[in-house]
Amino acid sequence: LYVGLVLGGVFLICKKMLKIPMADFKIGKPDVYPFWIIAAFAMPLLVILIYQLFAGTWQQSTLEAETLKQLVAGSVAYLGLATGIVEETVFRGIIMSSVEYAWNRKIAVIAPSVLFGCLHIEEGMSIPGMIQVVIAGSLVGILFSLVTCYTGTIWYSALMHGIWNCLMIGGLIHIGSAADSAVWYNYVLDTDSFLLTGGDFGVESSVISIAAYLIFAV
């Protein structure tokens, strides 16, 4: 419903107000190739694998069967597919395409990505935490923008975004200096270094994740 409302709203704006096909905003018919499915899973799995090089322990939380079902469903359907599609529709579809039409592709890739990073700043964050999350958010935004530019559609970046959310922040796996009892599996690091843990924002803004964004962007 969440995705349908957003895509329906975008369709009405494009068709009725702007008189521009959705395809011009890189929002066409969904089409997924095996390569992008592999890439979508490879990025979070690479991050998890690299963390195994650092001292820590795996811990499994004891969750009721119904709680686990709800956790998996929410991770896949909402934080994964829905959030990935909606955020890519807005940032890589509408905003990036509009900026590209107004200026050029380079600005279109960078400007919305920095905005994407800034919007992940949360109340109560320290200054280093803010800097860290803006850098990480901007880089992953640039990665998704490059994927969209290369393929000509938002659907591959939405797939990568969705799988990342599902595995890394959806409640299935948590990596940090302390366990989260609401998450199914925890990898508890022996260090509390903000570079490795991601500081205030978490593993998504860690140097390991940032390195993964850069590797896949190249």
Residue ranges and their predicted role:
Residues 1-84, 169-218:
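Specific transmembrane helices
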Residues 1-2, 103-112, 153, 201-204, ...:
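Membrane-interface starts of transmembrane alpha-helices
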Residues 44-52, 113-123, 163-171:
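Aromatic-anchored segments of alpha-helical transmembrane domains
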Residues 48, 80, 84, 105-121, ...:
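Small-polar-interrupted transmembrane alpha-helices in polytopic inner-membrane proteins
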Residues 78, 111-118, 131, 135, ...:
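Hydrophobic residues within alpha-helical transmembrane segments
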Residues 85-90, 94-95, 99, 118, ...:
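Active-site His/Glu-centered metal-binding helix of metallohydrolases
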Residues 86-111, 146-153:
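Membrane-interface helix/loop boundary segments of multi-pass membrane proteins
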Residues 131-195:
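Functionally important transmembrane alpha-helices
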